[in-house]
Structure formats: structure tokens, C-alpha cells
A protein has these predicted regions:
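Helix-loop-helix hairpin linking two adjacent transmembrane segments in secondary transporters
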Residues: 161-209
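Helix-breaking motifs and short loop linkers at transmembrane-helix boundaries and internal kinks
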Residues: 64, 96, 117-123, 151, ...
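Extracytoplasmic gate region of multi-pass secondary transporters
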Residues: 52-53, 237-287
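Conserved MFS/SLC helix-loop-helix module at the cytosolic interface between two early adjacent transmembrane helices
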Residues: 83-119, 298-299
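Cytoplasmic helix-loop-helix junction between adjacent transmembrane helices
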Residues: 127-166
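Juxtamembrane intracellular "pre-TM" segments in multi-pass secondary transporters
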Residues: 18-27, 212-241, 426
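A late C-terminal transmembrane helix in Major Facilitator Superfamily
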Residues: 353-390
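C-terminal transmembrane helical hairpin of 12-TM major facilitator-type secondary transporters
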Residues: 302-348
Length: 426
């Protein structure tokens, strides 16, 4: 049954329903357990995504992929995520979110379990796309779920997902390479992570209450909230400008994440373990999305994002033009990770949802997923081709240092007056 009508009603303030919602507000333990399980599912999602990158040299050697093919497989799964974005947005606005979440986790877990069975480029690409589609649907549904429940702290709520993603990004390469070494096969981690995804489905089905996942923004006792200053259409000047910035973010982050381990191992001659640590350090930077989200609830998000992208440009220049020492690589991999995955991902996502009315947040989240991951889908291939033509240093300059400046230009079109604030900004 469509849930559009209740959400439309919330747009006007929801005064009548607000007091009832307060009296039936779930116990703190129920909320903590429910959102803890949802966060754990996103940790598994991130681990599932990140394990491919440090194992790419072994996968290429085993299956005979070129660098360009490997780069496309490393980030090409995000094409499935991009394809999921818009339909996921409509589903989230119309179908119970808990059902969408469970189905999406099942899809990406099956895709992960099928990956070790690949015998060539075509079937592995198909399995990666299936995983990506499920992960894209989950990303849209999960961001709307937490942002709607914690509406006045939307950026911090989405930042908590970024922290979960960062934890998974940190653990994925380390756990994945450890499992691969222990079992003597790059296939073993995919089996382990796929089974973990199936297990979390059961835990969410039992431990997450429906009133946590189906909350409507602005309907839980917040009658004072007004939305008439927001655009009537979900695809408006702000969301389109933010989509351009988001696409730049996807090209930068996934291009970097997909081939940075290969750069460390082939150009700087790092061991597999050292490259895995460097990749995990990026995840530590992502975990700072809690701080970036907290800031996003309190300051002008356009200004915050501008500073973020300038930081990404500076850190990428230092990363690929500085010394090959481990401490240098680790420090600036962390800075780039916290700028792009910590701040840009969190604040572009929340700013998009704040630029639409409550019954349209699913479509805003879907647009974010589509724009971010459609760019991410080609990022590894583009970066690999630039490396083949220009070498690592100049390829990094154009893709990792110039593109954040494109995002800065797009942000000039964002109207801060048509973004819903938390009430803490002026």
C-alpha cells in the first residue's frame, strides 16, 4: 500500500499526530538496538564493497584481467548502485522501508556469494552489478530512515551512517586480506562477507521495529516546522546543483579508492598488508563523518562543502606529489578520506534531503545515490586510462585535484534560503 499520503500530511506540520506520536515513542533501548542493527548492516555493506580493492592484483593475476578491466570491475559495481538510485527513491516513498532494506541486503549478499564463482570478466561484472544494485537500494532506504527519524539532526544522523561506512571501510581490507591469506584464496573473503549479510537480515527482521523505519520527517511532535519555503518539486535548482557536486565526489572518491592500492603496490612497492592499511586509513577518515554531520547541522552547508572540496584538492596534490614514505601516505589518505567520504558524502546527502519537502525525501535520496554512483561507476576506468596516457601523477591531478573545484563551482548555484535548517543556524 502506498505511504505517500501520510507523508504528505506531515508536510503541513502534523500537529494532531504529533502528540500521539510522542506518547507512543519507543523506549531508548528499542531505538538503540534497532538503529544499532541498521548501522551494523551498513558496516557489512562497506566491508563487502572495500574487500575487492586490495585483492585486485591477485584477482587480475588469477583471471588475466588488464589494469583497465580491473579498474572497471573495482568501481563498476557502482553502476548497479546508480541504476538503483531513482527507482529506490520511489520505492522508499511508497513501500515499507523495512521490506526495502531486507530485500536490498539479500540482493547484495547473493551477488557477493556469486563473485568467487566467476570465471571471466563478463560473469564477474554481472555479479558485481547485482551486488551494487542491492547496496544502492539499501543506501537510499537507510539514509531516509535515519534522517526521517532524527529530522532535526539530519546531517548528524547521516553522518552516523558515514561512520558505520568508515568502520566497514577500515575493517574490510584488513579482515578480507587476512581471510584470503589464511585460506590461501582471494575467494574466501567474499564467501565470508556474503554469509554475514544473510545473517544480518535475520537480526533486522527480528530486532528492528517497524515504527523506527517508517517514521515521517516532521510528524513526531514538531508542529512548529514549516516547509512552504521549500521548492514544490523534488528536482529543483538546489538538488540539481548538489547532484553535480555529488557526481564529482563519486569520481574522486571511487577513482582514488579503486586504484590507490594498485598505485601503492606497483609504483611505490608497498606490500599487500601495507596497501591494505593505507586503504583502511581512508576508512578512518570516513568515520569522522559524525563530526562533519554535527557541523552540517550548525553551519551553512554550502560554505562547509566549499571548504571540504578545497581540502580534497590540497590533500590529493600532496598525496601524489610527496614522498613515498608510509606516514606521508597514511596522513594524506586520511585527510582525503575525511574530506570526501566524511564531509562531502554526508553533507551533500543531507542538503539534498533538506532541499525537498518531507514526502519527497525518498526521491532526493535516490537522486543522490544515482548521481554519486553513476559517476563512481566509471571512475576506476577513467583513472586507469588517464594513468596509461599521463602516468600516475598527472592522472591524479586531473581526476582527484581538479574535479573538486568543479564541485565548488556547482555549489555557487545552491540557494541556502531554500534548505530546511535544524533551527541552530542563522
Amino acid at each position: 500500500m502506498s505511504r505517500s499520503s501520510p507523508r504528505t500530511g506531515a508536510e503541513s506540520g502534523g500537529a494532531a499526530d504529533g502528540s500521539a506520536a510522542v506518547s507512543h515513542r519507543p523506549a531508548p533501548l528499542v531505538v538503540a538496538v534497532g538503529f544499532g542493527l541498521l548501522g551494523l548492516s551498513y558496516v557489512i555493506n562497506a566491508m563487502d564493497r572495500q574487500v575487492f580493492y586490495p585483492l585486485l592484483p591477485e584477482i587480475r593475476a588469477d583471471l588475466g584481467f588488464s589494469l583497465a578491466q580491473g579498474g572497471l570491475l573495482a568501481t563498476g559495481f557502482t553502476l548497479g548502485m546508480a541504476a538503483a538510485g531513482v527507482p529506490a527513491g520511489y520505492l522508499v516513498d511508497r513501500v515499507p522501508r523495512k521490506i526495502v532494506l531486507l530485500a536490498s541486503i539479500f540482493l547484495y549478499s547473493i551477488g557477493t556469494l556469486l563473485t568467487p564463482l566467476a570465471s571471466g570478466f563478463a560473469d564477474m561484472a554481472a555479479y558485481r552489478l547485482l551486488s551494487g544494485f542491492g547496496e544502492g537500494v539499501q543506501s537510499a532506504a537507510l539514509s531516509v530512515t535515519v534522517a526521517s527519524y532524527f529530522y532535526l539532526h539530519r546531517s548528524f544522523a547521516i553522518g552516523s551512517l558515514g561512520a558505520a561506512f568508515g568502520l566497514g571501510t577500515f575493517l574490510g581490507p584488513i579482515v578480507g586480506t587476512t581471510v584470503a591469506v589464511d585460506f590461501g584464496s582471494w575467494r574466501a573473503p567474499f564467501v565470508a562477507f556474503g554469509c554475514a549479510g544473510l545473517a544480518i537480515i535475520v537480526l533486522i527482521a527480528v530486532g528492528v521495529r517497524r515504527h523506527l523505519t517508517e517514521s515521517v520527517a516532521g510528524s513526531r511532535g514538531n508542529a512548529e516546522l514549516r516547509f512552504d519555503h521549500l521548492p514544490e518539486r523534488p528536482y529543483n535548482r538546489n538538488t540539481i546543483a548538489l547532484a553535480v557536486a555529488t557526481a564529482s565526489t563519486g569520481l574522486v572518491f571511487y577513482g582514488f579508492l579503486g586504484l590507490y592500492p594498485t598505485y601503492l603496490r606497483t609504483e611505490l612497492h608497498y606490500s599487500a598488508g601495507q596497501a591494505a592499511v593505507a586503504t583502511s586509513i581512508v576508512g578512518v577518515g570516513s568515520a569522522f563523518s559524525l563530526l562533519w554531520g554535527w557541523l552540517g547541522d550548525r553551519v551553512n552547508q554550502r560554505t562547509l562543502l566549499t571548504v571540504t572540496y578545497l581540502g580534497a584538492t590540497a590533500s590529493s596534490l600532496l598525496l601524489f606529489n610527496g614522498p613515498p614514505t608510509r606516514w606521508w601516505q597514511y596522513v594524506f589518505a586520511f585527510v582525503l578520506g575525511t574530506c570526501i567520504s566524511g564531509s562531502a558524502f554526508t553533507n551533500c546527502n543531507s542538503a539534498m534531503q533538506r532541499s525537498v519537502r518531507p514526502h519527497q525525501v525518498g526521491r532526493a535520496a535516490g537522486l543522490f545515490v544515482a548521481s554519486y554512483y553513476s559517476a563512481a561507476a566509471i571512475s576506476g576506468f577513467v583513472f586507469a586510462e588517464l594513468v596509461n596516457v599521463l602516468g600516475w601523477r598527472y592522472a591524479a591531478f586531473w581526476q582527484l585535484s581538479v574535479l573538486p573545484l568543479v564541485a565548488v563551482a556547482a555549489l555557487r548555484l545552491v540557494d541556502p534560503g531554500k534548505i530546511m535548517t535544524s533551527g541552530r543556524r542563522r
